[in-house]
Amino acid sequence: MIKPRTPPGTLELLPREQIAFQRMLDVIRRNYERFGFLPVETPVFELSDVLLTKSGGETERQVYFVQSTGALANAAESGDRSLPEMALRFDLTVPLARYVAEHEHELTFPFRRYQMQRVYRGERAQRGRFREFYQCDIDVIGKDSLSVRYDAEVLAVIHAVFSELRIGDFSIQLNNRNLLRGYFESLGVAEGERQLAVLREVDKLDKRGADYVRETLVGEGFGIPAEQVEKILAFVAVRSKGHDDALAQLAALEAAAESSETLRAGVAELREVLQLVQALGVPETAYCLNFSIARGLDYYTGTVYETTLTDHPQIGSICSGGRYEDLASHYSKSKLPGVGISIGLSRLFWQLREAGLIDGIEASSVQALVALMDEQGMPQSLDIARRLRAGGINTEVQMEPKKIGKQFQYAAKAGIRFVVLAGEDELARGVVAVKDLLREQQFEVSRDELASTLLVELEQSRAMV
């Protein structure tokens, strides 16, 4: 007999947790749609030459290549060596680039898309790191140009999502790659690849600490003078406290003697984002400037975001993203700038569960169980269930008569809150009895008012959370 087991690096949940996970997906989707984003889904596998055009090195080593055994057999029989190679997507950004380039003339720009699907990476399986995981992305794609105002709107989306998720206080940390690049230019670190390498090291500051970054930048790989490294560390230590302080920090940078044109461009973009964020109604306690945020990916060119939970910094970034100038340069001659964010929901959910932050009030998606006393009561039970479902109550029917105590036990174990009973006495009076297992109360209600009464009870419970 084969031992049942899941592959390493996958997250498989029991129904109680899956409901909580699904609720988070629903909240994210609802907020994405409220801000006018349209749903997109792309195939789980892509042609490998398309998928891997922009990648290489570590990314390519993590890709899962796939091919059907039938296709391989047919190719072997026919001697066809041109069988297209397929690969599972490792993020949602590259498939988006392909999608926009392929459908460019059918889309309306700026194109506002959200995508919530699983992606696959052959990473080393470890706690909290998955080979299959959900990403929940939004992007706004422009044609030729895209106003920095969209960068502010994306920040407002982040705030709306995590406010409704109610997983604790959070901070949206903002920076701009032009601001970083301009400051490094003023220190003589202007060469492209070298500057990108420094940015990657700076991005490790919160995870590895100042001593690690200092040793790395002074060391043989970079050889930056110690005095300049200290200036870099002082610069990236800047954190704003409130909206006015953020604007003051930017004004001071702009007025500095060593301020370069690139730095001033970054300051101007951040200033406009901050002013619009305030107009969008995001409270100043929800965001701050953090000059150490660089985002390790090379394609970010302007605004960058990272979001963290205030009381659980050990969880790390729960949402990140930024501005890029040319999404689909490998697939289209059109210039397609954009801005977007991604929520790695599988890892976030795992971290929240480990920290005890998952709300388990809804142990089941079933809200009512219609009990069955005897075979003669089956038609009545089915009629009651029909009425409940028509009234918006998720309902299960007990299909075989059992002792009422066992039916209560089943409902309690399954996490079903209400048990509806209709014996001969209740039927004669046109009512049903309802056992509320959450409040440990029993009451009677007319059949016509049953669904509306349960909806009120459920709404009151949600309001108390």
Curated annotation (Swiss-Prot):
GO MF annotations in UniProt: ATP binding; histidine-tRNA ligase activity
Pfam families linked: HGTP_anticodon (PF03129), tRNA-synt_His (PF13393)
Keyword Ligase: yes
GO CC annotation terms, alphabetical: cytoplasm
Enzyme Commission code: 6.1.1.21
The entry's keywords: Aminoacyl-tRNA synthetase, ATP-binding, Cytoplasm, Ligase, Nucleotide-binding, Protein biosynthesis
InterPro entries in UniProt: aa-tRNA-synth_II, aa-tRNA-synth_II/BPL/LPL, Anticodon-bd, Anticodon-bd_dom_sf, His-tRNA-ligase, HisRS-like_core, HisRS/HisZ, HisRS_anticodon
Catalytic activity, reaction form: tRNA(His) + L-histidine + ATP = L-histidyl-tRNA(His) + AMP + diphosphate + H(+)
Subunit field text: Homodimer.
Family note: Belongs to the class-II aminoacyl-tRNA synthetase family.
PANTHER family: HISTIDINE--TRNA LIGASE, HISTIDYL-TRNA SYNTHETASE
Name of the molecule in the record: Histidine--tRNA ligase
Protein's organism: Stenotrophomonas maltophilia (strain R551-3)
Primary gene name: hisS
